[in-house]
Amino acid sequence: MLDPEKYFNYIKSLDVEFFTGVPDSLLKSFCGYVNDVETKNHVIASNEGSAVGIGIGYHLATKKIPLIYMQNSGLGNAINPLISLCDKEIYSIPMLLMVGWRGEPGKKDEPQHVKQGRVMLSMLEAMDLNYFIIKGDKNEDYETTKKALDYASKNSSPAVLVVCKDAFSKYSYNKVQNNNIRFAAKSREAALAQILKKIPKDAAVVSTTGMISREIFETREAFNDGHERDFLTVGGMGHAASIAYGLSKYIKKSKMVFCIDGDGSVIMHMGALSTSGILGKSNFKHILINNGCHDSVGGQETVAFNIDFESLSVAMGYNF
């Protein structure tokens, strides 16, 4: 396995000084270390496409190569700027992508990751993105990383490090840097239990990716409730509000639809709030549980505690 600290220092020795992306469970040890030590040159982005955009801006300002990290499920968000801006036929922007390989063939994973893992390398090939696989062999992987950086530099093009499961050893990072986060994480499950008790029994529930959907499933089990009214958005992070809005628009108007969302999900595709807020009818209800972090993939902080969601919601057309 790769030691996150030593690997980080090795990458720094190759003149990679800026890091941005969206946290991933397979990369959580590396991302956790970066988050602990890089207070100035590290940005947790709203989504993977935004991370690529930030990396482009960094390169334009410095001519250096940024590292962009993400889970492979986030490649969809990154495709547009990678193809329409970074590609050698457009602006030819070099960057090093670090992509966690969820759903890697032959390795057990959650159902929503299996197809993504199976088609990922084919996707990269179709996009003409040269990839290099990181398996957790420190001698081989250091050389592989240098090859990837050399490729990005010489070809002025993105190169992809595909990181296998368990490539990084565990790192005990400071994943809760704020007492508010610690409190919010502990209280989320209790809040969900109260929400499920209070909403109408026949209401439809659309829940966001990560811990919220997992805990709703577990709470329903504990209450001996059925799951037929719930749509657990296990993939497609950031799209729960849009799904709930679409459902509320065409379901019987007498039936309520509750979107139970998280801060990381809302931030990822915040523009969707303008649609659900302005066009949503009285049967659409949007509940945000803000714990200030990406809890299910390592606990790295979001900027959510610095957002005035009440004012934002009013501006987006929501009624209180």
What is each of the regions a protein language model found here?
Residues 65, 271-273, 298:
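Short, function-defining helix-loop hinge/capping sites that tune catalysis or transport
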Residues 283-319:
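A contiguous pocket-lining binding segment that forms or flanks enzyme active sites
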Residues 250-261, 281-283:
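Phosphate-handling active-site elements
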Residues 1-154, 159-245, 249-255, 303, ...:
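Thiamine diphosphate
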Residues 75, 212-213, 239, 264-267, ...:
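Short, catalytically relevant binding-site loops at active-site mouths
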Residues 70-73, 255-266, 271:
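DG-centered beta-turn motif at the end of beta-strands
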Residues 83, 92-95, 269-290:
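A short alpha/beta connector and helix-capping loop motif
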